[in-house]
Amino acid sequence: MKVENIESSKGNKIANQFVITDDVGNQYFQSYNSMIVKKVNCSNFYKIELDQKYWNYSNTTGKYRNIFLGETITETKKKIKSGEYILTDLNK
């Protein structure tokens, strides 16, 4: 398991915003003590799961979630609506 701070566009490590990679290549975005996103490694693509409660909890969470996913909030909402992204409880 590997834990790293998310980096700003200037390369600075951001406190309390983490990317976690497990031993099978799944990646997680954690903001403070809450899991926000899980990228499930499916060999040649990632299946995205978002925490149903915290995925859009605050502006700060959203800013770093967007960096982690490489997209805007508008794109994320479209993918949730289409079913491409799954809302689930990542903090149970």
Question: At which residue positions do the language-model features occur?
Answer:
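Terminal leader/tail segments of proteins
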Residues: 1-92
